[in-house]
Amino acid sequence: MSLITAGRLCARILGAKNSPCALIAARQASSSANLKDVLSDLIPKEQTRIKNFRQQYGKNVIGQITVDMMYGGMRGMKGLVYETSVLDPDEGIRFRGYSIPECQKLLPKAPGGEEPLPEGLFWLLVTGEAPSQEQVNWISKEWAKRAALPSHVVTMLDNFPTNLHPMSQLSAAITALNSESNFARGYAEGVNKTKYWELIYEDSMDLIAKLPCVAAKIYRNLYREGSSIGAIDSNLDWSHNFTNMLGYTDPQFTELMRLYLTIHSDHEGGNVSAHTSHLVGSALSDPYLSFSAAMNGLAGPLHGLANQEVLVWLTSLQKDLGGEVSDEKLRDYIWNTLNSGRVVPGYGHAVLRKTDPRYTCQREFALKHLPNDPMFKLVAQLYKIVPNVLLEQGKAKNPWPNVDAHSGVLLQYYGMKEMNYYTVLFGVSRALGVLAQLIWSRALGFPLERPKSMSTDGLMQLVGSKSG
């Protein structure tokens, strides 16, 4: 999206003709295929734009904080600046202003492919501009060139016990990659802070390039008897190399991986993994340490393990009710789940109030490629029934399915049945969004994050309540 388009969008949202966003100068898509060169041109302009904005509007109040917000996980509290994506309760995620369907149409595809290449989304997240095919090809080759793992990380991965969770292995390996950090080395040598973003960029590009190798190594060691991941092919895209290293050769699975890695990449800045990387990065920890911390957050059952919980529930449902199930029996099963104090996994979202567009695009993929798969048919049947049951129950603010209601079913269909591994794929994808933002956080000089905390007694005193 050009800056002038973004400005018009912002002005429309804010309802102000003279909104600072509306004053942005027009910017054409950059012709250079080198992402760092494009950033070098964009960053000074954005620094000036934000400086002027803060000078004029820095004291403006943008919201109120309630006691419930402080006890309720800061839900709805506006407290972060996060550039790469915005989550709208009704529309879902927008990557630099573009919806998922728009990205599917706009972003370059692999030869003969129909799904967007994650490389294109990364370019969009970093620059705000939809890339050309040449620019996406440059990213693919750049990541292939940077993909090799240092020997100590390979040795580390090969010596992990097989009962160590894949996410623990991923986090540990990413932390160990910090030995390669350009930023950590440059900071120790006293590099000028105006150069921070350049070193963060180099580390982020290196880390994204290496993640499929780390993830594939974990998969092969745990589930394929330690067989080799093979070599990176510089003529293939990032997702294609990843699926090859995992050991999957079905072109449809590669297309699914392109879609999966694109749609799981970013979801605004307040979720656990994005906020964690932002917080840790604000201490000037390098991208390896920041992203490793984010992965520890993603490993939590309330964040990245949800797709695994969906499959466990679906498998249990099939076991209890058998193959084809009538709508009436399915409805009774859902009510039994709710009445026992449990939730229906894959339904509801902290922000969204309509069907997650990430669910919708996966459903469209399934309708095209696996319409008769029994598990997909069950998911489609649930889509017709669960929202109505949840509305009848009256507790759910959002009765609609989220991304996790579908992704595991697709992976299972193509033979990836190792549910413990699914969050690793989520983590590889999430690197695109949080590292794109980390580059901008350092370019814009965001300070150490340090909100004020209060005790319950302090809150009671503030609002005039008696603590006794």
Curated annotation (Swiss-Prot):
* Taxonomic superkingdom: Eukaryota
User: What Enzyme Commission number does this protein have?
Assistant: 2.3.3.1
Where is oxaloacetate annotated to bind? R358, R430, R450
Q: Per the entry, what span does the transit peptide take up?
A: 1-30
Biological processes, Gene Ontology terms: carbohydrate metabolic process; citrate metabolic process; tricarboxylic acid cycle
Q: Which top-level enzyme class is recorded in the Swiss-Prot or TrEMBL entry?
A: transferase
Q: Where in the cell is it found?
A: Mitochondrion matrix
Main site of residence?
A: mitochondrion
The Swiss-Prot or TrEMBL record describes its family as follows: Belongs to the citrate synthase family.
Give the function comment from the record. Answer: Key enzyme of the Krebs tricarboxylic acid cycle which catalyzes the synthesis of citrate from acetyl coenzyme A and oxaloacetate.
Q: Which NCBIfam families match?
A: cit_synth_euk, PRK09569.1
What more does the entry say? Citrate synthase is found in nearly all cells capable of oxidative metabolism.
Name the UniProt record assigns to this protein: Citrate synthase, mitochondrial
Q: Which organism is it from?
A: Xenopus tropicalis (Western clawed frog)
Gene from which this protein is expressed = cs
